[in-house]
UniProtKB/Swiss-Prot annotation:
The name this protein goes by in its record: DNA-directed RNA polymerase subunit beta''
GO molecular function, one term: DNA binding
Organism whose genome encodes this protein: Oryza sativa subsp. japonica
Protein family: Belongs to the RNA polymerase beta' chain family. RpoC2 subfamily.
Comp. bias regions, Acidic residues: 680-707, 738-767
A Pfam match: RNA_pol_Rpb1_5
Record's catalysed reaction(s): RNA(n) + a ribonucleoside 5'-triphosphate = RNA(n+1) + diphosphate
Keyword Chloroplast among record annotations: yes
Primary residence: plastid
GO biological process: DNA-templated transcription
Compositionally biased residues, Basic and acidic residues: 659-679, 726-737
Length: 1513
């Protein structure tokens, strides 16, 4: 009893780790049998207690952590600050990503630690706590997800998802968090299914390689060893794990005393003596040489001493043990288990955090500033890097604290800075001890807005490749995206322009035609007109209907929604076109508003030639009636013929007087020629404003028209264009139809040869392609250029109908038959007209034409005029009917096929349209428009917009336009070949003006970009009284030169009149008013009259606030940024009520312009060339912040947001490009920080759109520490594949060693030693890499298991061709030991090189063909073995299993052992070889250098400590 009282009673909890230690000590003391008896009793006790306790889980047991709320709030605040820094351009995207990960990872980890203490303190008997922390079921990570927070998740590719899950499973997830969690669940399912199979297959291959490795002998007699030394950075834990269970290869001496002998196995006691000795005498410690499976001299088996102790019972491994199978299972099985582990954690992202050093108390910090170097942390924060251990003192009021910071750490505070308690002062560099995989990852940064790319001189302006757009960054610098207003669709030109924007003609690209106004009668499109003012200006309403409407209170228009979606595809070859929407009110109030507008066309670069059409509009009076199709006939002249005299008067042009029939053949031919089609190709403008998409779908679905089959252009197409049916309402023809008997009476009809054509549709143009479902361009529209305009006085419209039917459709009418209105043509088609039917069969479709009119059979054929237009007197009944002008008929020849002599005449009704030029002038354009001002001439011309005799057709609800009224520009000066035009839109508070500016000279205020495309700045103002006062920044001579070429300035929108107008003002009607410093209220004229708003006009007159490089100090009294634009005095009073305005002008002296570059150097330049301030978003700084700080800024300087240069912070980042006395203008820009080595996409000055790729970062990141990422790496190493992220390619290094070592040593020795060294080095490297994967997962695998596998992978050499051998053929794979023995047995040397084989190839290159055949490629292996006559000695396990024999392990091992007489003199032979070994060490000095210079895995215990491989001892 007394003895029992002396025992220590341990009364504490025990977890899984402590249980492992207890069992290990029990085995050491009592052996396996007694230990199992003790553990059985513990098991019984545990089950009994668990049964009586009956622990169950409830939701109340999941205790949440109280501190979670403020922890998450703190992390969110840090993330917000990080986002702000990124917006300012202080950190780049990779730093932002890293810091975001670490913020949330640190928060999650802190919560996990809090969870442990919370359970332990508040509820130690909590079932969740007991279950998970005792190791019974679950782990800390799963409980943390239940009661803490899930944190950052990884997607299926292993990449981190930026949005952390802040909730835990106890609280419940939001919808977003749930969806992100589903990624992890999916990842777990995929891993369980796929990766488990991978791990199982890996195990099978590993066992296949080493299944024949059996312990067959006690000692192989090797003299090789591997050295282990703790001096080179090996941790004590690794040192112990490496030595325990091994066998010594040499005697160990301390001084002259031997403490361990050769072939002695190392236990825990001996290891402790080694550690004690090394601690006492660290510099005198000798490396310990041990035996490993690498050093065993046997070929296909292993000896007891090279293997060491068995892992199961702690003694030397027994003979007959299948250590190969055990090794394969030991490596493969953790992969299977760890694969399943991810299913439970659900893809939660785990990262690594650096160790932080915190201040112990408040106080001032001090350190030696000479020992640190400024640097930038991984998160973009400024810091100091210390190269050696740094001593830091923190001096509080009464205590002096001293903290030692290890080398290569980051100091996060400045010297002499006051720090608070627990403040982070240093960060110990992560990676010194952590074993993480690194991988190179590309991160693409995309533009957040449209803009123009700009970079500093730090970027290589030459691209990486000759024609590429990729550039490398030599050092860290900023990229700037200068904001622009991109007009990718023309809608943007009306909706996205803000006040004080200035637009250029080049930016107006109307990619299609608009439908202006309102369509009341159409049921499909219902529009609402919103009257919006003020803040809601420029509002776009989106409806689910096909069209949309835009309104801003001043004007409105509707545009097809197809333009919004496909504006990139529209109009590739179209010039820039700018449409001004105008509403046209007819006199009748009852009729709906007719919608049409004046369209202004400005060509590319704004260059106008002579006789250019500047503007045009479509008169609704010349639109085709409602529904119907037909052809247009006219006699026309082109504009080029305008100045030629007319040969005939209008009466002679249009045929003979009424009731007069010419009979002479010459007159017939003359008349026919006048109305014959002119054979030029011009596509008809089917619809002026475009057709909604759904109409084309219907048309194509019904007829199956292919793109290339529609409108193949032929020169002789006449009367051929028709409309597809089912689109038009029937129109009654007053001529009726022919009698039925006339059809039988006449034979087959044939058209005249000149009317006959092979294909009537015309070729589609490039921009009129018809694709199913997508309207790329409005079919039939063509560039409305001067070449194709026909100026006519009268034209005729003749009804005709065309149907395009599929080839397979069955017609219900016959060719050349006469039908009536609404006759059924096919199953789903009915006719709209009555008349003669003509059918033509084409390769891909069938054309069916219906000619309306009467058929007459003349008695005398030669008296009939073919192709004539004849007026009919009987149709003139009264004046009302004559307005319709339906008093003409069109006569055509038709011939009967059966009887060549019989002819008949088809008389078709024609509608005549008269054009009166004088009527348009009063209503559309003011008369002063046609006055010659500034040598420019503008005149009105009516053009017909259809080809003669081409078929026009109505589609759906739109009306076809016959006549277009155009405004044609001309000038008298012959030396001027071109004019310049630009459009300017100005917006005031309640006023909008659009200006058209046309000038004969290049504008002096035109701005030239680097690409030399001239762009106009706006109006040039003139004042009749004193021209020198008008433009203060030009010299008098320059302005006088301008006045010689006066320009016409027209406003395109006039709200004062109820009808539309194109008003032209001379330049002298404009003036400007500037407010100066003596004005008390710069934003208003007088405080007593608050009704007067001062509009902020910057869009047009920015040049008055100082252009680029205006010398500011010279203009002392020019200060304000607000300007007022007046057109004339009447308009001024009417709109702005500025009667009380005191005209307070000061004469400003003219200045020369100068440019200030980025280095603040000034240079004068010609005022004709300036930089381009177009398409910019403006931001104004306070007026009072300029004078004091003029030296701080310069032109072109980039300023980041929130920089305190003045009294107030800069509110927006951008580039300074206009400098005034009291203010400067910043062009808004977004900075992006890019690091060294990043790749920049695009060119300098290139316009980028939102979403375009800007920069690509290449950075290293730690791989997700998930076994699903690590397991493939183990497989790749075993298969000897190249792994970029782990190290340089091992195979390449082996090739280098194979070449260099024989070259240095030379001769046969070189190959022998070179192969030995190469194999030894590669073995150590491979073991290190595999252990790194498993240790990162916390899995402990003994090195000997991996060494047995690697021994087989590296056991082959390839016979070289350098020395021919009679035994082996070049290229043959043989075992290393076999090659060495053959070399010693033969007189000649065998040359060979080391080779690295994967486990699959090794399995197929064994000594047993039965084992190979049972693994893979059975037929091939057996066939080759039969041809070679191979013999299988059945040494392995698989061969015997396949053949049903006894396997040579365990009890079956005795039958395969052949006893050899032991050589008693072996030890003395080893002693005799000592001399040889010392000589070899001198030769192999290179080996140690090779190993130590290997930079594969630094700070790794294998690379640094076990590497001195000594082949002879």
């Amino acid at each position: 009893m007394a003895e029992r009282a002396n025992l220590v009673f341990q009364n504490k909890e025990i977890d899984g780790t402590a249980m492992k230690r207890l069992i290990s000590r029990l085995i050491d003391h009592f052996g396996m049998g007694y230990t199992s008896h003790i553990l059985d009793q513990i098991k019984t006790l545990g089950f009994h207690q668990a049964t009586t306790t009956s622990i169950s889980l409830g939701i109340e047991d999941l205790l949440t952590i109280p501190s979670k709320g403020w922890l998450v709030q703190d992390a969110e605040q840090q993330s917000f600050l990080l986002e702000k820094h990124y917006y300012y351009g202080a950190v780049h995207a990779v730093e932002k990503l890293r810091q975001s990960v670490e913020i949330w990872y640190a928060t999650s980890e802190y919560l996990k630690h809090e969870m442990n203490s919370n359970f332990r303190i508040t509820d130690p008997s909590n079932p969740v706590y007991l279950m998970s922390f005792s190791g019974a079921r679950g782990n800390a990570s799963q409980v943390h997800q239940l009661v803490g927070m899930r944190g950052l998740m990884a997607d299926p590719q292993g990449q981190m998802i930026d949005l952390p899950i802040q909730s835990n499973l106890r609280e419940g997830l939001s919808l977003t968090e749930y969806i992100i969690s589903c990624y992890g669940a999916r990842k777990g399912v995929v891993d369980t299914a796929v990766r488990t199979a991978d791990a199982g297959y890996l195990t099978r291959r590993l066992v296949e390689v080493v299944q024949h490795i059996i312990v067959r002998r006690r000692d192989c007699g090797t003299i090789q060893a591997i050295s282990v030394s703790p001096q080179n950075g090996m941790t004590e834990k690794l040192f112990v794990q490496t030595l325990i269970g091994r066998v010594l290869a040499n005697d160990i001496y301390i001084g002259s005393r031997c403490i361990a002998t050769r072939n002695q196995d190392i236990g825990i006691g001996l290891v402790n003596r080694f550690i004690t000795t090394f601690r006492a005498q660290p510099f005198r410690a000798q490396p310990i040489y041990i035996r490993t499976p690498f050093t065993c001299r046997s070929t296909s088996w292993i000896c007891q001493l090279c293997y060491g102790r068995s892992s199961t019972h702690g003694d030397l491994v027994e003979l007959g043990e299948a250590v190969g199978v055990i090794a394969g299972q030991s490596i493969g099985e953790p992969g299977t288990q760890l694969t399943l582990r991810t299913f439970h954690t659900g893809g939660v992202f785990t990262g690594g955090t650096a160790d932080l050093v915190r201040s112990p108390s408040n106080g001032k910090i001090q350190f030696n500033g000479d020992l640190v170097h400024p640097t930038r942390t991984r998160h973009g924060q400024p810091a100091f890097l210390c190269y050696i251990d740094l001593h830091i003192t923190i001096q509080s009021q009464d205590i002096l604290h001293s903290v030692t910071i290890p080398s290569k750490s980051l100091i996060l505070v400045q010297n002499d800075q006051y720090v608070e308690s627990e403040q982070v002062i240093a960060e110990i560099r992560a990676g010194t001890s952590a074993l993480h995989f690194k991988e190179k990852v590309q991160k693409h940064i995309y533009s957040e807005s449209d803009g123009e790319m700009h970079w500093s001189t730090d970027v290589y302006h030459a691209p990486e490749y000759q024609y590429g757009n990729l550039r490398r960054l030599p050092k860290t610098s900023h990229l700037w995206i200068l904001s622009v207003s991109m007009c990718r669709s023309s809608i943007a030109s009306f909706s996205l322009h803000k006040d004080q924007d200035q637009m250029n003609t080049y930016s107006f690209s109307v990619d299609g035609r608009y439908i202006f106004g309102l369509s009341m009668a159409d049921d499909e499109v219902r529009h609402r007109l919103l009257d919006t003012f003020g803040k809601k200006d420029r509002e776009i309403l989106d409806y689910s209907t096909p069209d949309r409407i835009m309104s801003n209170g001043h004007w409105n228009f509707v545009y097809p929604s197809i333009l919004q979606n496909n504006f990139d595809l529209l109009a590739k070859k179209r010039r820039n076109r700018f449409a001004i929407p105008l509403q046209y009110h007819q006199e009748q109030e009852k009729e709906p508003i007719s919608c049409f507008g004046i369209s202004i066309e400005i060509p590319f670069m704004g260059v106008l030639r002579r006789n250019t059409i500047v503007a045009y509009f479509d008169d609704p009076r010349y639109k085709k009636d409602k529904k119907g199709s037909g052809i247009v006939k006219f006699r026309y002249r082109t504009l080029e013929d305008e100045y030629r005299t007319r040969e005939k008067d209008s009466e002679n042009e249009y045929g003979s007087p009424e009731n007069e029939y010419r009979t002479r053949e010459e007159e017939c031919k003359t008349l026919e020629d006048e109305y014959r089609t002119r054979e030029e190709e011009y596509e008809t403008l089917e619809d002026e404003y475009g057709i909604p998409e759904n109409e084309y779908e219907t048309l194509e679905d019904e007829y199956g028209i292919l793109e290339d089959e529609y409108r193949t252009r032929e020169e002789e197409s006449e009367d051929e264009y028709g409309s597809p049916e089912n689109k038009y309402r029937p129109r009654e023809d007053k001529y009726g139809t022919l009698e039925e008997d006339s059809e039988d009476e006449h034979g087959t009809l044939e058209e005249d040869s000149e009317e006959d054509s092979e294909d009537e549709y015309g070729n589609p143009e490039e921009d009129s392609v018809l694709k199913k479902g997508v309207l790329i361009e409005h079919r039939g529209t063509k560039e409305f250029s001067l070449k194709y305009q026909k100026e006519v006085d009268r034209f005729f419209f003749i009804l005709q109908e065309l149907h395009i039917l599929p080839r397979s459709s069955s017609l219900k009418v016959l060719d050349n038959s006469i039908i009536g209105v609404d006759t059924q043509l096919t199953k789903n088609t009915r006719s709209r007209l009555g008349g003669l039917v003509r059918v033509k069969r084409k390769k891909s479709h069938t054309e069916l034409k219906i000619f309306s009119g009467d058929i007459h059979f003349p008695e005398e054929a030669d008296k009939i005029l073919g192709g004539s237009l004849i007026p009919l007197e009987r149709e003139k009944k009264d004046s009302k009917e004559s307005k319709k002008r339906e008093n003409w008929v069109y006569v055509q020849w038709k011939k009967i096929l059966k009887s060549k002599e019989k002819y008949f005449v088809l008389v078709r009704p024609a509608v005549a349209y008269e054009m009166n030029e004088g009527r348009n002038l009063a209503t559309l354009f003011p008369q002063d428009l046609l006055q010659e001002e500034g040598n420019l001439q503008l005149r009105l011309v009516n053009f017909i917009s259809h080809e003669n005799s081409k078929l026009t057709q109505r589609i759906y609800h739109t009306n076809s336009q016959f006549v277009r009224t155009c405004l044609v520009l001309n000038w008298e000066q012959e030396e001027k070949e071109e004019a310049r035009a630009s459009l300017v839109e100005i917006r005031a508070n309640g006023l909008i003006r659009d200006f058209l500016r046309i000038g004969l000279i290049k504008s002096t205020i035109s701005y030239t970009r680097k690409r030399y495309d001239s762009r106009s700045a706006g109006l040039i103002l003139h004042n009749r009284l004193d021209r020198t006062n008008t433009n203060s920044f030009y010299s008098k001579a320059k302005i006088q030169s301008l006045s010689q070429h006066q320009e016409a300035i027209g406003t395109l929108l006039n709200r004062n009149k109820e009808y539309q107008s194109l008003m032209v003002l001379s330049a002298s009607n404009c003036s400007r008013i500037g407010f100066f410093k003596n004005s008390k209220n710069p934003n208003g004229v007088k405080e007593s009259n608050p009704r007067i708003p001062i509009p902020k006009f910057w869009g047009l007159f920015r040049n008055f606030s100082g252009l680029l490089g205006t010398i500011a100090p010279s203009i002392s009294n020019f200060s304000s940024s607000y300007y007022l634009l007046t057109y004339n005095q009447i308009l001024l009073k009417k709109h702005l009520l500025l009667d009380n305005l005191k005209q307070n002008f000061k004469v400003l002296q003219g200045l020369k312009h100068s440019l200030i570059n980025e280095n603040q150097r000034t240079s004068n330049f010609d005022s004709n060339i300036m930089l381009d301030p177009f398409q910019l978003n403006w931001h104004f700084l306070p007026h009072d912040s300029w004078e004091e700080t003029s030296a701080k800024i310069h032109l072109g300087q980039f300023i980041c947001e929130n920089v305190c240069l003045f009294k107030s912070h800069i509110k927006k980042s951008g580039q300074i490009f206009i400098v005034n006395i009291d203010s400067f203008v910043i062009r808004a820009a977004k900075p992006y920080l890019a690091t060294t080595g990043a790749t920049v996409h695009g060119h300098y000055g290139e316009i980028l759109y939102k979403g375009d790729r800007l920069v690509t970062f290449i950075y290293e990141k730690a791989r997700s520490s998930d076994i699903t990422q690590g397991l493939p790496k183990v497989e790749q190493i075993f298969e000897a594949r190249s792994i970029d992220s782990l190290s340089p390619n091992l195979e390449r290094r082996i090739e280098d060693w194979n070449e260099r070592i024989p070259r240095i040593l030379g001769g046969p020795w070189g190959f022998l030693i070179g192969a030995e060294l190469t194999i030894a080095q590669s073995r150590i490297s491979l073991v290190n890499k595999i252990q790194k994967v498993y240790r990162s997962q916390g899995v402990q695998i003994h090195n000997r298991h991996i060494e047995i596998i690697i021994r087989q992978v590296t056991s082959k050499v390839r016979v070289s061709e350098d020395g021919m051998s009679n035994v082996f053929s070049p290229g043959e794979l043989i075992g290393l030991l076999r090659a060495e023995r053959a070399g010693r047995a033969l007189d000649e040397s065998i040359y060979y090189r080391a080779i690295l084989l994967g486990i699959t190839r090794v399995s197929l290159n064994t000594q047993s063909f039965i084992s190979e055949a049972s693994f893979q490629e059975t037929a091939r292996v057996l066939a080759k073995a039969a041809l070679r006559g191979r013999i299988d000695w059945l040494k392995g396990l698989k061969e015997n299993v396949v053949l049903g024999g006894i396997i040579p392990v365990g009890t079956g091992f005795q039958k395969f052992v052949h006893r050899y007489p032991q050589n008693k003199n072996l030890y003395f032979e080893i002693q005799k070889k000592k001399l040889f070994a010392s000589e070899m060490r001198d030769i192999l000095f290179l080996h140690t250098e090779l190993v130590s210079s290997d930079s594969d895995v630094t700070n790794n215990f294998y690379e640094t400590s076990e590497s001195p491989f000594t082949p002879f001892i």
